[in-house]
Amino acid sequence: MKKTIFVGDLHLSADRPDITQAFIYFLNHGLDNTEALYIIGDLFEVWMGDDIAESFTIAIAEAIKTVSNSIPVYFTHGNRDFMVDKQFCLRAGMKILPEVYCINLYGVNTVILHGDSLCTLDIAYQRFRRFRSLDIVRWVYSHLPKKTRLNIAAKIRQKSVQGNQQKHYEIMDVESSAVTALLASTGCQRMIHGHTHRPAIHQLTAQEQRVVVGDWYTQGSVLNVSEKGCELVTLPFSETN
């Protein structure tokens, strides 16, 4: 049966070669009968700029390119890799999607996004999110020296980890009113997102559904969508060696 696959929150980095290995294995062996692949944010733990190419990012681009030569591969920016630009996506053969993207998926109107915009109770993060989304901020960052960008990325990552440890569970999850509002404004019956690292299929009403993809910290997490519905599948790293 034909299917569309969604993954997100891989947080690939040079420090976790096991995740990179698992993802490349998935790209090479886990896409049978797949019509399209959606990577919905935080593919990388941090992205310093398309002009700073680490060896593992080159390997990832080449592996994705092999897939995109056969099927469409779509990419949504996350909160960690929001600086990924056209250069990398061109190398990987990925099409960059807008922050909120709607598609009719096997007869169900579906809205796709990373999900951080739905965590409206996290006021401090939403303030930072608006700031880093400004064109002038992105322009200034992209023109900083490479060493400076590396230092900024390291500090942002450290501050994010420390901040999340102090936040309540509810603050770091999506806000139900934000979910309801987005479904209403887009006219969709299904929402697919990541960001929270809490994989689940939530049946909101008889007609509406919210599906959350999982992270790849301890195992792979894949969402298969077909005409039969949605299925969350785990990929143990032990099977990718």
Curated annotation (Swiss-Prot):
One Gene Ontology MF term: UDP-2,3-diacylglucosamine hydrolase activity
Pfam assignment, any one: Metallophos
InterPro entries given in the database record: Calcineurin-like_PHP_ApaH (IPR004843), LpxH-like (IPR043461), Metallo-depent_PP-like (IPR029052), UDP-diacylglucosamine_Hdrlase (IPR010138)
GO cellular component terms, A-Z: cytoplasm; extrinsic component of plasma membrane
Pathway info: Glycolipid biosynthesis; lipid IV(A) biosynthesis; lipid IV(A) from (3R)-3-hydroxytetradecanoyl-[acyl-carrier-protein] and UDP-N-acetyl-alpha-D-glucosamine: step 4/6
Keywords from the UniProt entry: Cell inner membrane, Cell membrane, Hydrolase, Lipid A biosynthesis, Lipid biosynthesis, Lipid metabolism, Manganese, Membrane, Metal-binding
Matches recorded under CDD domains: MPP_YbbF-LpxH (cd07398)
Name listed for the protein in its UniProt record: UDP-2,3-diacylglucosamine hydrolase
Gene source species: Shewanella frigidimarina (strain NCIMB 400)
Lineage: Bacteria, Pseudomonadati, Pseudomonadota, Gammaproteobacteria, Alteromonadales
